[in-house]
Design a protein with these regions (language model features):
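Domain-scale recognition of functional cores that engage charged ligands
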Residues: 1-183, 281
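Terminal amphipathic alpha-helical/low-complexity segments used for targeting or macromolecular assembly
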Residues: 110-121, 125-282
Length: 282
C-alpha cells in the first residue's frame, strides 16, 4: 500500500520494538546505546511501563524489591480481571512457560472457569504492561529475538487509490500491520515473577477518545483525583464533596508524608506541588 504516490505506507512495529530500540544508537553518529549507557552507569534493574496509565508507580520500590527478592530476570504486575469477558490479556502458563494469553485466544469456557480453592477466576491475572527486567536479561533478548512471532493487527490504513491517485481514509479495516508486543519475551525468562496489585490504586488506562465513557481522559482524571482524596482521608483529613485536589508525586508518591493534614477539612480544589500549599485549600 502507498501512503503517497511516491511513498510506501509503513507503521511502527508495536511496543515489542522496545528491545531492538535499546540496542540502537542514542543519537546519530554515536555508538552509545541505551544498553551500553545502562552498563556504563552500572544499572542492574529496569522498570518499564505503558505510558497510558496515569496511576503507574514509577520505579515502585515494592515491585522492584519483590522482583529482586524473587531473583527474577523479568517480572510483571497484574490486576484481577473485573469480569470473565473483560478485554484484557492474562498472564498464564502455556506449554510450561509464562506468557500473556490474549483475550481473543481464550474460549468462553476458559474465561469463565473458576479456581476450585478460591472461587475466583482461574485466568484472572490481567496484564497491565508494567514490567521489571534485569539489564542482564535485556542484553540476552537479542539472542532469541528472531524467534519472536509477529502479531497481526487489522487496521484502518490511509492510502492512495492507485487508479485515481486520491488519498483514501477508510472507515473500516483494510489492511494488516505486523506488530511485536513487549510481553513476547516472557516465555524466554529463566525466573519469572508476578505481583498482583489493586486496580484502583495502580491501573487507569487511557485508550479511548473523550466522552467514550470508559478508559478515556475523563475516567483517568476521575481515578487520579479519587486516589489523591484517599491519600488525604487515610492520613486523617476530610475532603468536602466536589472538592478536587491533585497532589504532585513530589509531595507524596503513594500517600506517605501527609501527616500534617490530620484533622484538617479541605474545602477548596487545587493542584498541590509543595506540602505547604495544602494549607491554602482548607
Amino acid at each position: 500500500m502507498l501512503e503517497t504516490p511516491s511513498k510506501v505506507a509503513v507503521a511502527p512495529d508495536g511496543n515489542g520494538g522496545l528491545y531492538a530500540a535499546t540496542r540502537s544508537p542514542l543519537s546519530p553518529g554515536k555508538s552509545d546505546t541505551v544498553l551500553s549507557d545502562l552498563a556504563k552507569r552500572k544499572v542492574l534493574y529496569v522498570h518499564a511501563y505503558c505510558v497510558d496509565n496515569c496511576l503507574v508507580r514509577v520505579a515502585d520500590p515494592v515491585f522492584l524489591g519483590y522482583s529482586i527478592q524473587k531473583q527474577a530476570d523479568c517480572a510483571a504486575k497484574v490486576v484481577p480481571k473485573t469480569q470473565p469477558t473483560e478485554s484484557v490479556g492474562v498472564v498464564a502458563v502455556r506449554g510450561n512457560k509464562y506468557s500473556v494469553v490474549e483475550y481473543s485466544e481464550i474460549s468462553k469456557e476458559q474465561a469463565e472457569r473458576r479456581d476450585s480453592e478460591t472461587g475466583g477466576l482461574a485466568f484472572r491475572a490481567g496484564n497491565i504492561a508494567n514490567h521489571f527486567y534485569t539489564t542482564t536479561y535485556l542484553n540476552r533478548v537479542e539472542s532469541f529475538e528472531e524467534d519472536l512471532a509477529f502479531h497481526i493487527a487489522r487496521k484502518k490504513i490511509p492510502h492512495v487509490d492507485l487508479e485515481t491517485g486520491n488519498s483514501v481514509k477508510p472507515s473500516k479495516p483494510n489492511g494488516m500491520k505486523l506488530e511485536m508486543f513487549v510481553f513476547d519475551v516472557f516465555p524466554y525468562t529463566e525466573r519469572f515473577a508476578v505481583l498482583e496489585v489493586e486496580r484502583n490504586e495502580e491501573f487507569s488506562p487511557l485508550k479511548n477518545a473523550p466522552g467514550t465513557g470508559s478508559d478515556d481522559p475523563e475516567s483517568s482524571r476521575r481515578d487520579l483525583l479519587a486516589q489523591h482524596k484517599r491519600f488525604l482521608e487515610i492520613a486523617g483529613a476530610q475532603v468536602r464533596d466536589k472538592v478536587e485536589i491533585e497532589i504532585s508525586p513530589l509531595v507524596s508518591y503513594a500517600g506517605e508524608g501527609l501527616e500534617s493534614v490530620k484533622g484538617k477539612v479541605y474545602t477548596k480544589s487545587g493542584l498541590v506541588e509543595a506540602a505547604e500549599e495544602l494549607d491554602a485549600l482548607v
